[in-house]
Amino acid sequence: MAHGLPDYGANTPKVTVYGLSDMAELAVRLGSFVSYDRQGDVMCLDGFESGLRGFLTGGDGLGNSVTQDSTYSRNGAFSAKMVCGSTLGRSATLNKFLQYPVMGNLGIEFSSTMHADIETLKVSAAIYDGTNSFIARLIYNEDTSILTYLNSAGAEVPLQAGLVLEEHPYLFHTLKYVVDYKNRKYVRAMLDERSWDMTDIPLYSTLSANPPNMLIAIGAIGKIAVNAAIHVDDFIITQNEP
Protein backbone atom coordinates (compact mmCIF):
# COMPACT_ATOMS: atom_id res chain seq x y z
CA MET A 1 0.00 0.00 0.00
CA ALA A 2 1.30 3.44 -0.88
CA HIS A 3 1.82 5.38 2.32
CA GLY A 4 0.94 8.76 0.79
CA LEU A 5 1.64 12.19 2.17
CA PRO A 6 2.11 12.91 5.88
CA ASP A 7 -0.86 13.78 8.04
CA TYR A 8 0.19 17.37 8.62
CA GLY A 9 -2.25 17.61 11.50
CA ALA A 10 0.11 15.38 13.46
CA ASN A 11 2.52 18.30 13.72
CA THR A 12 0.14 20.14 16.01
CA PRO A 13 0.34 19.01 19.64
CA LYS A 14 -2.82 17.31 20.95
CA VAL A 15 -3.85 16.84 24.54
CA THR A 16 -5.80 13.57 24.44
CA VAL A 17 -4.93 11.79 21.17
CA TYR A 18 -2.12 11.41 18.63
CA GLY A 19 -2.34 12.12 14.91
CA LEU A 20 -1.61 9.51 12.24
CA SER A 21 1.48 9.82 10.07
CA ASP A 22 0.85 6.79 7.84
CA MET A 23 -2.12 6.06 5.55
CA ALA A 24 -1.49 2.31 5.81
CA GLU A 25 -2.05 2.54 9.55
CA LEU A 26 -5.28 4.44 8.96
CA ALA A 27 -6.51 1.75 6.57
CA VAL A 28 -5.84 -0.99 9.12
CA ARG A 29 -7.64 0.93 11.84
CA LEU A 30 -10.63 1.24 9.52
CA GLY A 31 -10.77 -2.53 9.13
CA SER A 32 -8.40 -3.55 6.32
CA PHE A 33 -6.76 -6.95 6.80
CA VAL A 34 -3.62 -5.67 5.01
CA SER A 35 -1.96 -5.47 8.41
CA TYR A 36 1.20 -7.59 8.19
CA ASP A 37 3.84 -5.98 5.97
CA ARG A 38 1.76 -3.09 4.48
CA GLN A 39 4.23 -2.31 1.70
CA GLY A 40 3.37 -2.19 -1.99
CA ASP A 41 0.12 -1.26 -3.76
CA VAL A 42 -2.70 -3.78 -3.60
CA MET A 43 -3.61 -5.52 -6.87
CA CYS A 44 -5.89 -8.13 -5.39
CA LEU A 45 -7.10 -9.07 -1.92
CA ASP A 46 -9.61 -11.63 -0.73
CA GLY A 47 -10.66 -12.70 2.74
CA PHE A 48 -13.13 -15.29 1.38
CA GLU A 49 -16.08 -13.39 2.87
CA SER A 50 -17.99 -13.82 -0.41
CA GLY A 51 -17.05 -17.44 -1.02
CA LEU A 52 -14.51 -18.92 -3.43
CA ARG A 53 -16.00 -17.80 -6.74
CA GLY A 54 -12.80 -16.01 -7.76
CA PHE A 55 -10.64 -19.09 -7.22
CA LEU A 56 -10.13 -22.40 -8.98
CA THR A 57 -10.10 -25.16 -6.39
CA GLY A 58 -8.99 -28.76 -6.70
CA GLY A 59 -7.01 -31.58 -5.20
CA ASP A 60 -6.17 -35.24 -5.44
CA GLY A 61 -7.13 -38.25 -3.38
CA LEU A 62 -10.18 -39.48 -1.53
CA GLY A 63 -12.05 -36.79 0.41
CA ASN A 64 -10.16 -33.75 -0.87
CA SER A 65 -12.05 -30.45 -0.87
CA VAL A 66 -11.65 -26.68 -0.66
CA THR A 67 -14.62 -24.78 0.76
CA GLN A 68 -15.58 -21.53 2.45
CA ASP A 69 -15.62 -22.16 6.20
CA SER A 70 -16.75 -20.20 9.24
CA THR A 71 -15.07 -22.30 11.94
CA TYR A 72 -11.76 -20.42 12.00
CA SER A 73 -10.53 -17.18 10.42
CA ARG A 74 -7.74 -14.65 10.81
CA ASN A 75 -10.08 -11.76 10.05
CA GLY A 76 -13.77 -11.55 9.29
CA ALA A 77 -16.18 -14.46 9.51
CA PHE A 78 -14.78 -16.86 6.92
CA SER A 79 -11.66 -18.56 5.59
CA ALA A 80 -10.91 -21.19 2.95
CA LYS A 81 -10.76 -24.70 4.40
CA MET A 82 -8.37 -26.95 2.48
CA VAL A 83 -8.85 -30.68 3.09
CA CYS A 84 -6.19 -32.92 1.55
CA GLY A 85 -7.07 -36.24 0.00
CA SER A 86 -6.18 -39.37 1.94
CA THR A 87 -4.98 -41.37 -1.08
CA LEU A 88 -3.06 -40.87 -4.35
CA GLY A 89 -1.59 -37.34 -4.45
CA ARG A 90 -3.10 -36.44 -1.03
CA SER A 91 -3.48 -32.77 -2.03
CA ALA A 92 -5.75 -29.73 -1.94
CA THR A 93 -5.21 -26.67 -4.16
CA LEU A 94 -6.41 -23.08 -4.25
CA ASN A 95 -5.54 -21.18 -7.45
CA LYS A 96 -6.00 -17.53 -8.44
CA PHE A 97 -5.64 -16.34 -12.04
CA LEU A 98 -4.78 -12.68 -12.66
CA GLN A 99 -4.14 -10.54 -15.71
CA TYR A 100 -0.59 -10.22 -16.97
CA PRO A 101 0.89 -7.54 -14.68
CA VAL A 102 3.18 -4.62 -15.31
CA MET A 103 6.63 -6.07 -14.72
CA GLY A 104 8.18 -5.02 -11.43
CA ASN A 105 8.31 -6.10 -7.80
CA LEU A 106 5.22 -8.11 -6.92
CA GLY A 107 4.28 -9.37 -3.46
CA ILE A 108 2.40 -12.59 -2.65
CA GLU A 109 0.93 -12.97 0.83
CA PHE A 110 -1.48 -15.28 2.63
CA SER A 111 -2.09 -16.61 6.13
CA SER A 112 -2.64 -20.22 7.11
CA THR A 113 -3.08 -22.49 10.08
CA MET A 114 -0.84 -25.55 10.41
CA HIS A 115 -1.61 -29.13 11.37
CA ALA A 116 0.53 -32.12 12.33
CA ASP A 117 -1.03 -34.17 9.52
CA ILE A 118 0.15 -31.72 6.85
CA GLU A 119 3.30 -32.84 5.06
CA THR A 120 4.02 -29.74 2.94
CA LEU A 121 2.49 -26.35 2.23
CA LYS A 122 3.64 -24.46 -0.85
CA VAL A 123 2.82 -21.30 -2.75
CA SER A 124 3.80 -20.64 -6.35
CA ALA A 125 3.62 -17.43 -8.36
CA ALA A 126 3.95 -18.07 -12.08
CA ILE A 127 3.95 -15.50 -14.86
CA TYR A 128 3.39 -16.62 -18.44
CA ASP A 129 4.40 -14.32 -21.31
CA GLY A 130 3.31 -16.48 -24.24
CA THR A 131 6.73 -18.05 -24.70
CA ASN A 132 8.08 -18.78 -21.22
CA SER A 133 6.91 -19.19 -17.66
CA PHE A 134 8.77 -17.69 -14.70
CA ILE A 135 8.04 -19.39 -11.39
CA ALA A 136 8.76 -18.26 -7.83
CA ARG A 137 7.88 -20.89 -5.21
CA LEU A 138 8.27 -21.36 -1.47
CA ILE A 139 7.69 -24.70 0.23
CA TYR A 140 7.34 -25.38 3.95
CA ASN A 141 7.91 -28.96 5.07
CA GLU A 142 6.06 -29.63 8.31
CA ASP A 143 7.96 -32.86 9.04
CA THR A 144 11.45 -31.39 8.68
CA SER A 145 10.61 -27.80 9.73
CA ILE A 146 12.51 -26.51 6.68
CA LEU A 147 11.46 -23.64 4.41
CA THR A 148 12.79 -24.04 0.86
CA TYR A 149 12.57 -22.13 -2.41
CA LEU A 150 12.59 -23.22 -6.03
CA ASN A 151 15.87 -22.26 -7.70
CA SER A 152 16.67 -21.62 -11.36
CA ALA A 153 17.52 -25.30 -11.90
CA GLY A 154 14.12 -26.43 -10.61
CA ALA A 155 15.52 -27.78 -7.33
CA GLU A 156 14.26 -27.03 -3.83
CA VAL A 157 16.97 -25.20 -1.87
CA PRO A 158 16.81 -24.69 1.93
CA LEU A 159 16.16 -21.12 2.97
CA GLN A 160 15.71 -21.76 6.70
CA ALA A 161 16.02 -24.88 8.85
CA GLY A 162 14.61 -25.35 12.34
CA LEU A 163 11.50 -23.35 11.49
CA VAL A 164 8.88 -24.83 13.81
CA LEU A 165 5.35 -23.45 13.38
CA GLU A 166 2.84 -23.77 16.20
CA GLU A 167 -0.07 -26.03 15.26
CA HIS A 168 -3.23 -24.44 16.62
CA PRO A 169 -6.53 -24.01 14.77
CA TYR A 170 -6.90 -20.40 15.92
CA LEU A 171 -3.33 -19.39 15.04
CA PHE A 172 -2.70 -18.16 11.49
CA HIS A 173 0.90 -17.90 10.29
CA THR A 174 1.54 -15.22 7.64
CA LEU A 175 3.85 -15.78 4.68
CA LYS A 176 4.84 -13.09 2.19
CA TYR A 177 7.49 -13.01 -0.48
CA VAL A 178 8.46 -10.42 -3.08
CA VAL A 179 9.59 -11.20 -6.61
CA ASP A 180 11.25 -8.91 -9.16
CA TYR A 181 9.62 -10.19 -12.33
CA LYS A 182 11.23 -7.52 -14.48
CA ASN A 183 14.66 -8.97 -13.77
CA ARG A 184 13.37 -12.51 -13.03
CA LYS A 185 14.74 -12.69 -9.48
CA TYR A 186 13.57 -13.16 -5.91
CA VAL A 187 13.76 -10.14 -3.59
CA ARG A 188 12.84 -11.18 -0.05
CA ALA A 189 10.65 -13.51 2.00
CA MET A 190 8.90 -13.17 5.35
CA LEU A 191 7.19 -15.67 7.63
CA ASP A 192 5.69 -14.33 10.84
CA GLU A 193 8.49 -12.43 12.61
CA ARG A 194 11.32 -13.70 10.40
CA SER A 195 12.62 -12.31 7.11
CA TRP A 196 15.20 -13.40 4.53
CA ASP A 197 17.08 -11.42 1.91
CA MET A 198 16.79 -13.26 -1.42
CA THR A 199 18.29 -10.53 -3.59
CA ASP A 200 19.64 -11.69 -6.96
CA ILE A 201 18.46 -15.31 -6.66
CA PRO A 202 17.19 -16.11 -10.19
CA LEU A 203 13.79 -17.63 -10.86
CA TYR A 204 13.04 -20.97 -12.45
CA SER A 205 11.91 -20.59 -16.06
CA THR A 206 10.67 -23.00 -18.68
CA LEU A 207 9.12 -22.88 -22.13
CA SER A 208 5.36 -22.38 -22.13
CA ALA A 209 2.90 -21.43 -24.84
CA ASN A 210 0.29 -20.27 -22.32
CA PRO A 211 -1.07 -16.81 -23.22
CA PRO A 212 0.08 -13.96 -20.96
CA ASN A 213 -1.36 -14.27 -17.45
CA MET A 214 -0.37 -14.73 -13.82
CA LEU A 215 -1.22 -17.72 -11.63
CA ILE A 216 -0.93 -17.88 -7.85
CA ALA A 217 -1.25 -21.43 -6.53
CA ILE A 218 -1.48 -22.51 -2.89
CA GLY A 219 -1.14 -26.23 -2.37
CA ALA A 220 -1.14 -28.53 0.64
CA ILE A 221 -0.16 -32.20 0.80
CA GLY A 222 -1.30 -34.33 3.72
CA LYS A 223 0.05 -37.50 5.21
CA ILE A 224 -1.03 -40.94 4.05
CA ALA A 225 -4.49 -42.25 5.01
CA VAL A 226 -5.75 -39.06 6.70
CA ASN A 227 -7.72 -36.05 5.46
CA ALA A 228 -5.42 -33.33 6.79
CA ALA A 229 -7.04 -29.88 6.92
CA ILE A 230 -5.81 -26.30 7.22
CA HIS A 231 -7.49 -22.91 6.91
CA VAL A 232 -6.20 -20.18 4.59
CA ASP A 233 -7.17 -16.51 4.92
CA ASP A 234 -6.21 -12.96 3.87
CA PHE A 235 -4.92 -13.58 0.35
CA ILE A 236 -3.10 -10.44 -0.91
CA ILE A 237 -1.22 -9.61 -4.13
CA THR A 238 0.71 -6.32 -4.31
CA GLN A 239 2.73 -4.43 -6.90
CA ASN A 240 5.35 -1.66 -6.68
CA GLU A 241 7.02 -3.40 -3.75
CA PRO A 242 10.32 -1.91 -2.54
Feature locations, PLM:
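Localized edge beta-strand/strand-to-loop motifs within extracellular or lumenal beta-rich domains
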Residues: 171-187
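Short, aromatic/His-centered strand-loop micro-motif at the edge of beta-sheets
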Residues: 151-174
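Flexible glycan-contacting loops in extracellular carbohydrate-active proteins
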Residues: 199-233
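Extracellular glycan-recognition surfaces and repeat-rich motifs
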Residues: 52-88
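Secretory/extracellular carbohydrate-interaction modules
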Residues: 77-150
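Extracellular carbohydrate-recognition regions
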Residues: 2-60
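Extracellular beta-strand elements of beta-rich domains used
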Residues: 48, 230-237
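Beta-strand-rich interaction surfaces with strong enrichment in secreted/lumenal proteins
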Residues: 33, 94-100, 160-167
